[in-house]
Structure formats: structure tokens, C-alpha cells
Amino acid sequence: MMKAIRSFSILLSLWFAAFACAQTSADPVDVYIHSEMQREHIPGLSLLVAREGRIVRAQGYGLANVELQVPVKPETIFQSGSVGKQFTATAVMMLVEEGKVKLDDSIKHYIKGAPAAWDQVTIRELLSHTAGFGDYPKNFNFRKDYTESDLLKIVEDIPLAYPPGTRWSYANLGYLTLGILIHQVTGKFYGDFLKERIFQPLGMSTTRIISEADIIPNRATGYRLVQGQLKNQEWVSPTLNTTADGALYFSVLDLAKWDAALYTEQVLKRASLDQMWSVTKLSNGEPNSGHYGFGWEIETRDGYRVIGHGGSWQGFRTHISRYVDDKLTVVVFANLESAETGRLTDHVAKMYLDAH
């Protein structure tokens, strides 16, 4: 392993040196990415730039697997982290359009036996992280296997952090619960619903629920830095790679298909998409402090309107930013849990925006 890590460091240094020497003629995006990969010790990275749903650049950098010296390609598959939440939110909005779910209904209408404390918790609040749900408890065992009922019981036993609708607080357990809602409303496991209703119709052939047991061509390995040393990701139980808070595989090529579909009504009606991309309001009428819609963050950066989301899971960091008015989308995936993919995404976007 140490030999592989040394080889990786040498290889990345050689790449950077080559680009530094030829900086006057090299592509400035390549120069920037290689420089940042060296600075952050990122093994591998995948980049997508798209305009109006058409690919401008889909490129891999570095290594998908350090030990086997496998390079990243546009086809390389990374784990989604919380970028997967936008697919959960889309699935819920599909059910809303079909009249099977109402945004302002209590979650108790859809999840049998939910506690009395959830009486006032609405689907809208779960989608926007304003329901009072929290994150996994500190003593949660990520290496234990759970049934869906086990996970729901854990969530139900955690008191609400605040009255629903009064505050914003990012809540993975809220999205986990939405995945269970999808299952109970449709009779289909969350991942199967996404495959049938989103991934297959859009031709997202490599996007699926995580399974470390299955043979997955082009799958990247996730890494972490421990006291400056590159280490493999820590493993979690198979159950926790199937939850709706962000447990997908995908490539930047599949995200390009997703991005293109968002310019159409192929997945959802325009009114539903606009609702997802609008900052929700608290019960006092004020916008939530997280600038959050349904599965998307909505921000203004340097005068540009941006909808996006980041993710982190099992040695991977991901980010998607869609510059709405400029019809520019930038996606960065990295196989290092500490990679600053959001910052990289913004910088690459600025390079393209400044060039036009």
C-alpha cells in the first residue's frame, strides 16, 4: 500500500511539473485542476462542464484506484453522498404530481405508527430540512446492518430538535425517512423506484444504489487522509448504502444526462422544478437560513443565481452547481473525503463565465 501511495505521489508530482512547465500553452482548467489536486492530495477527480444540457467537457484526472494505478475516466463511477438527495426529492415530487402525496400533509398520513410528535411534521418540511429532524446520533453504529423498520424506529426515538417549520437544520434522517415514505406509498424500494422512474428513462445506465458486493465496472475507490497518509475509506454496513439521504453510484456522464433532463419536463413539470428550486419559508414567513428548496441549495454567488448541492460519503466528495441564468453546469467528483469539491466547482465555473 505504501509503495502504491508513493507511486501516486510521484505520478501526481510529475503531472503537475509537466503542466507547470507548459503553462503558457496548457489548458487553464487542466492547470488549475492538477494544481489543486496536488495541493489537496486528491488521488482522482472527474469533471463535467455542460451548457444548456450539452457536454462541453467531461474529463478524468488522476487515479480511480491508487493500489492498481487505474486512471479516472469520464466513465468512472463515484459515490454520490448528499448530491443524491435531489433524486429523493424528485421522486417525492413525482408522487405529488400523481396525487399520491400532498406536500402539506403530516408524515403520519404515509408512515404507519409514526409517533405523536410527528403530527405536525409535513412532507414539505422534511424536503426542506425544517422538520426538526436531526442527524445520525453520536452512538450510531455505522457497521451494523439494519432493517428499514430498525432505522425508522431509531429516527422515531430521537426527539424533535425544534417545533416543525420554525428553524432550518440539515437533517440526513429526514431524507432517510422520505425514502421509507416512497417505499410505503408505492410498494417499491426507494432505489428500485428511482431506477424505474428516473435512471432508466433518462439513460443513466451506471446510476444505481451502492452495493460494495456487486461487480461494478469502472468503480472508483474512496480514500481519506490520516495524519497526511492516504488510507482506504472506512466501511459501513450494506444497509447504510441503500438509504435515501445519499447512497448512489454515478458518473459525470450520467449527471450530464440528468442536467439535460432538467431543462425539459421529461422528469417533472416546470412548476414542480421551480418549487424545488425556490427557498422555502418558515412558519413565520421568513426564508429558511439554509437557502434550501427541495433537495437543492439556492444561492447567489458573485451576482450569479446558482442551484446546487454537495455530498460526502465513504471517502468521496461531490458537488454540482447549476448557474441558472447562464445555463452552465459544473460537476466535480473526487475520491478523497476532504476534497474541497464545492470550491473547485465554483472556480471552474468562474473560468467559463469569465470567458464569455
What are these model-predicted stretches?
Residues 23-59, 183-196, 200, 226-356:
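Catalytic loop of the DD-peptidase/beta-lactamase superfamily, centered on the K-T-G motif
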Residues 77-79, 110-114, 137-142, 163-167, ...:
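Second-shell loop/turn segments in exported
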Residues 68-72, 156-161, 233-241:
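Short glycine/proline-rich turn/loop motifs
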Residues 41-81, 86, 99:
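N-terminal, post-signal-peptide region of Sec/Tat-exported proteins
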Residues 1-10:
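Bacterial N-terminal signal peptides that target proteins for export
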Residues 44, 74, 79-83, 95-138, ...:
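Active-site helix/loop module of the DD-peptidase/beta-lactamase fold
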Residues 9-18:
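Bacterial N-terminal signal peptides
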Residues 82-83, 169-172:
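Catalytic nucleophile serine of serine hydrolases
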